[in-house]
Amino acid sequence: MAANDTIGDMLTRIRNANLARHQTTQVMSTRMTRSVASVLKDEGFITSFEESGEGVERRLVITLKYRGKNRQPIINTLQRISKPGLRVYSNRRDLPRVLGGIGIAIISTSSGIMTDRDARQTGVGGEVLCYVW
């Protein structure tokens, strides 16, 4: 597992599991990955997530969501925006709208991890972690 970019690793694992139509995937459990998974669950992109293991071996088991009998993934695209080599910040007036409001941007703010919609309502800006649609 990539120890330096846990969010990038998490998004890649979810993307790969979606392409392979897996029911679950495991990612390293950190406070940040738990917060991002919580936002994805609240927005309906994943079914659930739970923590397993102890200490260094803690993992988040994420249950993915599909629609129809052909099992089309709910998540079409997961795009990492702010990376360790190039951080992307946005103030409250310039928060991005993803696909005109169809998708979400996950923002790391001083009030915690939230969607672009919640950040706009709260009136805070922050680091743009990723886009999901």
Curated annotation (Swiss-Prot):
GO MF entries: rRNA binding; structural constituent of ribosome
Superkingdom of the organism of origin: Bacteria
Keyword RNA-binding: yes
Gene Ontology biological process terms, A to Z: translation
Stored Pfam families: Ribosomal_S8
GO cellular component, one term: ribonucleoprotein complex
Keywords associated with the record: Ribonucleoprotein, Ribosomal protein, RNA-binding, rRNA-binding
NCBIfam families recorded: PRK00136.1
Similarity remark: Belongs to the universal ribosomal protein uS8 family.
Function, as annotated: One of the primary rRNA binding proteins, it binds directly to 16S rRNA central domain where it helps coordinate assembly of the platform of the 30S subunit.
HAMAP family: Ribosomal_uS8_B
Subunit comment: Part of the 30S ribosomal subunit. Contacts proteins S5 and S12.
Protein name: Small ribosomal subunit protein uS8
Originating organism: Acaryochloris marina (strain MBIC 11017)
Gene name tied to this protein: rpsH
